[in-house]
Amino acid sequence: MNEDLLEKVYQENLEERIISFLAEKERISLEEAMDIYYNSKLATMIHKGEYGIQYLDYKVLVEILLETEPELMQRS
């Protein structure tokens, strides 16, 4: 496997963990959690690999999402 493929697989697994933990923590459906995550600035930062944020623990990333983008929770 090349490095780009490994990074893509890692990112997909990270997104799954973020969405699952967000749904569990906020007691919302997986669909709602997906909508929140994929409409967040955090998702964009992770996708672009900005600041190495994608290497933080998924639980920390969920806390960052909840603290920095609370307006997304109003949508669910």
Regions from the language model: what does each represent?
Residues 1-76:
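C-terminal alpha-helical interaction appendages
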